Amino acid sequence: MMVRVMRYKKVPVKKIVNKIIDECDVILLVLDARDPEMTRNRELEKKIKAKGKKLIYVLNKADLVPKDILEKWKEVFGENTVFVSAKRRLGTKILREMIKQSLKEMGKKEGKVGIVGYPNVGKSSIINALTGKRKALTGSVAGLTKGEQWVRLTKNIKLMDTPGVLEMRDEDDLVISGALRLEKVENPIPPALKILSRINNFDNSIIKEYFGVDYEEVDEELLKKIGNKRSYLTKGGEVDLVRTAKTIIKEYQDGKLNYYKVDLKKYGQDRERDISFITKYLKDFPFIEDAKMIVTHLKDFDGLYKKIKKPVLGSEEIDGNIVVVSFGEKTKDACRKKVENLCRERNIEVLSKFGDKIGANNIYVAVGKRVKE
């Protein structure tokens, strides 16, 4: 018996875009709220308006941007602008109502809605948030959504998803926006420097606080400092600039690094603060100033090997030193970030630090002194 397998038919992007403009009544242009200008397509906007279609600007990832900045963007894009966070399901109700209102203004009880935008701005995630179901394929890799798909918003309103709309322009911007897959980029250093330069121009304190480095210029020397801070070294002991650059791009795309300061007090809000079950093993430990020796010492205790249910982040004063511990995060790098942010929050000068794994738990320890203001 022969089984027929249904496969997605790859449809040219331009053909799908033209189909959206021709067939849909309302078109959602999805932009990255962190940098809307970089992710907009003015040529497409003009074409949509020339066809007499309703255009709604959807600024996704708005939860990463301060409210006063969003208000400035609304002045730029006008009243047909909606701020959403598809990931957190924020603003989607307002978007649904704006779609219905747009159709009503057109005198239509039924209608079709098209969604366009660059890869990784969140088109498919917005569809999922609007419909309440995972009806469209989603992913962080550029070009995952394939072909043409219709999904139902209401009984009378349908949405059509589309692959990212690409135009020939600066290759660095294509890398930054996610339109070009990072693993295929031969030289990630220029786009990484472009991200750092934009952030530096917006607020030059953000890079210093996020990476914990001092710098004068945005150049390869800054990349070296960041790479050294992250311990991204080659076998020869040199800073791995390619890995450093790719990390900067990835963390920007993931929303970890952006134009706006993170509230450090909120960074560890879901973490237990009681680390006494760890520090009890450090009483009378003679090398408390050495973070690496602390971690090595803790490996001797079986009670720390079982996977904990909830990550822990906290600090404790031992023999005149402040010991900061992050324990149980998904990665060692996540532990490191928690520790560094807590040290900044509590004004602790770090003298030694080290991360490793104890059984099923990642751990990162920093030892320092509290700086008097």
Curated annotation (Swiss-Prot):
Name the UniProt record assigns to this protein: Uncharacterized GTP-binding protein MJ1464
Family named by the database record: Belongs to the TRAFAC class YlqF/YawG GTPase family.
Domain CP-type G: residue ranges: 14-168
Native species: Methanocaldococcus jannaschii (strain ATCC 43067 / DSM 2661 / JAL-1 / JCM 10045 / NBRC 100440) (Methanococcus jannaschii)
Matches recorded under InterPro entries: G_CP_dom, GTP-bd, GTP-bd_ortho_bundle_sf, P-loop_NTPase, TRAFAC_YlqF/YawG_RiboMat
SUPFAM superfamilies registered for this protein in UniProt: P-loop containing nucleoside triphosphate hydrolases (SSF52540)
Entry-linked PROSITE patterns: G_CP (PS51721)
Residue sites binding GTP per the record: G117, Y118, P119, N120, V121, G122, K123, S124
Listed GO MF terms: GTP binding
Domain of life (superkingdom): Archaea
Short name of any one Pfam family annotated for the protein: MMR_HSR1
Keywords: GTP-binding, Nucleotide-binding
